[in-house]
Structure formats: C-alpha cells, structure tokens
C-alpha cells in the first residue's frame, strides 16, 4: 500500500494542512520555571521542516496554582512563558509549519520524585489520584469556574500569539478525564453523576468557554482516551451508545476534532466491529478525528519507556483504515522523537532509513 494518501491536504475551518501527519503531544520537561527556551523552539521547528502537517505541542498548563507537578513543564500563562511560546510559534511559522498548543491541567497527580510541589494542593473533582486513593482536594464550584476561565484565557492567548488551532487535554487520567471517570469523580453536585454524560459537564463548559473566547472559525481539538495512567484497562464507554452520549454533547459545545488516544491504534474499540476509537468517534459525531497509538513502531510506549527498543513497523494496516475513511489525521509520537525527518522519509519512500526508538531519545531535545 502507498503512504502517499497521507500526503493529501486537509482543511478544517481556518486550519489548512499540507498533509495528514500530526506530531503527537509529548511531555518533554525542558522549560525551566515553565518558560519554553530557544531549544524548545528549535525542536518544534525541526519537525515542521521535516514535513509534519500539524504539530501539537507538549502539554502546557493553564493558570491554576496546582495545574502541574513539574517545574520544567511549560506554562501557558504569564509574561515570560507566553513570550517563550511566541518565539516557538514564530520559528515554526517561519518554516511554514502549523501548530496548536495542548492546554493542560494535570489534576490530582503524584508528586515528582524530586519532591517539588506546587504552591497549592493538587485539585480534582473529588481529590482522588486513583480509585480509593486521596491525593489532593476536591474542587469547589468557584475553583471549577476559575479553571474553565483559565482554559478560555489560554485559548485566547494562543490565537493572539499566532497559533493555528488549540487542543484541550481531556485524556489519560488528568483533570478533565478525572471528571469523566467515575472512580475519581464522586461528586454529588451537577459536576458528578452516575452516567458518563453527566460527568462530562465540566468538559462541556470548558469547550463552550473556549469557543466563546476564540470565535467560530478557530479549530478546537479535544484529546480523549479510554485508558488512564492510573488504569490502562479502564473503559469510560463500554458501548457505542455510551460513547455517543459522551461525545455528542462535546461536539455540540464546539469540538471540531477528536484526538482519540489508544495504546495501539489497531485495537477495535467494541466487539462486533474492527473500528478503532477514532473510527467510532467519527461515526458517532460526524466530526473529524485523529488516530494515535504505536503508529509506525513495533512496540507500544510502555515497553519503550521500560527500556525496550522499538523498530519501524509497516503502515499497511494504518493505511487500510485511513483509506476506508475511519479517521482524517494520524498522530505520530515516538518516531518523531527518534527522527525529526520521519514524515519526509515516509513521503519520499525512504522507510529503510527510519530510526529505531529507544528511551535515550527522551533525554535530549534533538
């Protein structure tokens, strides 16, 4: 099968991409005191030069006292961090790149081994870091309202700085996902509930506020997942009906693009169909979707981060699903850490030149 189909242009509202390859957001922790450095700008610009269609930044936290557990994760608020991000997007656009920041609040998380702590307790829907385990405080309705506005302000700043779209991180067991997930959301007010649709209210309010802040034509991507860092086997939606009740209100609130995170993109989401998560999200909402999960590599991220070297893998199954129309865009993570020119090599048919991935690639901004 030919990968040339991935190099068709794509348009979504004001977003125009030269191809369907997305750089997946990957935490790098190279922004001391939350400020992206010139090396961060160079790192992203190299991927733009390497023919990535859309770069989604590493998660960058919104303006809450405990939105991060790492002083080297970039902020998306404050004069110095925003100046750092302005330098990033200017450098990316200078090489005709297209980029969206991924706006993030980590929620209730474990402290880093270094012992660094934010200036306030970690916050979440009910204070749970994992099922049955308290690790922070429950947010008040005032906290929730301020967090909604923090996301909206960050999105407005992204547009002002010159980014092309914005992504909201609603996956992997972080704050928004902690509201989605019943074991970490035990609230009895309007932000809790027995159904996933009820627990999606917080995310719906964020999306609405972001849409109001950026206007109708600036695209909003929402990253979502079934799995959590706290439980890789977790399932928010166990049926297509539950998934529809979860995602349709988010689409109606303003999501243009669902970024559907799986550990392995080829895994079917429900029995009776080989559609993956992105395929079901597109079918149920009619919105464009991004698939992601071990694209182009032999092993998933867990094995890789535990020291196993991942080798290049055929794209045939990915292309079969893409050609069928299951999803619109393809996010690539670790291959782009190992090789900034991955997309160009795929485009030019140079797959024999692709690099392996090992965890040593995480040690630098190469």
Which residues make up each language-model segment?
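Flavin-dependent oxidoreductase catalytic cores
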Residues: 1-366
């Amino acid at each position: 099968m030919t990968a040339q189909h991935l190099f068709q242009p794509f348009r979504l509202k004001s977003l125009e991409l030269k191809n369907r390859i997305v750089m997946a957001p990957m935490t790098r922790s190279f922004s001391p005191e939350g400020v992206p450095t010139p090396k961060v700008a160079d790192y992203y610009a190299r991927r733009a030069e390497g023919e990535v269609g859309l770069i989604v930044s590493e998660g960058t936290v919104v303006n809450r006292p405990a939105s991060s557990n790492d002083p080297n994760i970039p902020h998306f608020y404050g004069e110095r961090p925003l100046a750092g991000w302005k330098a990033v997007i200017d450098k990316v656009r200078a090489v005709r790149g297209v980029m969206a920041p991924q706006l993030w609040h980590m929620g209730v998380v474990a402290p880093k081994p270094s012992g660094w702590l934010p200036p306030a307790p970690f916050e979440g829907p009910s204070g749970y870091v994992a099922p049955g385990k308290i690790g922070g405080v429950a947010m008040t309705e005032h906290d929730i309202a301020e967090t909604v506005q923090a996301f909206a302000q960050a999105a407005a700043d992204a547009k002002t700085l010159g980014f092309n779209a914005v992504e909201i991180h609603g996956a992997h067991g972080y704050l928004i996902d902690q509201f989605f997930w019943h074991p970490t959301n035990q609230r009895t007010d309007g932000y809790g509930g027995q159904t996933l649709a009820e627990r999606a209210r917080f995310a719906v309010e964020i999306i609405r506020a972001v849409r109001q802040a950026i206007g109708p034509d600036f695209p909003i991507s929402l990253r979502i997942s079934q799995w959590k860092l706290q439980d890789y086997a977790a399932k928010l939606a166990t049926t297509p009906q539950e998934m529809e009740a979860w995602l349709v209100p988010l689409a109606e609130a303003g999501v243009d693009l669902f970024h559907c995170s799986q550990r392995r993109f080829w895994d079917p989401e429900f029995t009776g169909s080989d559609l993956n998560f992105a395929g079901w999200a597109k079918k149920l909402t009619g919105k464009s979707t991004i698939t992601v999960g071990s694209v182009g590599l032999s092993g998933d991220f867990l094995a890789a981060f535990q020291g196993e070297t991942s080798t290049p893998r055929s794209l045939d199954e990915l292309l079969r699903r893409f050609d069928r129309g299951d999803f619109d865009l393809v996010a690539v993570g670790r291959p782009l850490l190992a090789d900034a020119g991955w997309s160009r090599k795929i485009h030019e048919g140079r797959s024999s030149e692709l690099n392996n991935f090992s965890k040593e690639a995480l040690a630098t901004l190469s």
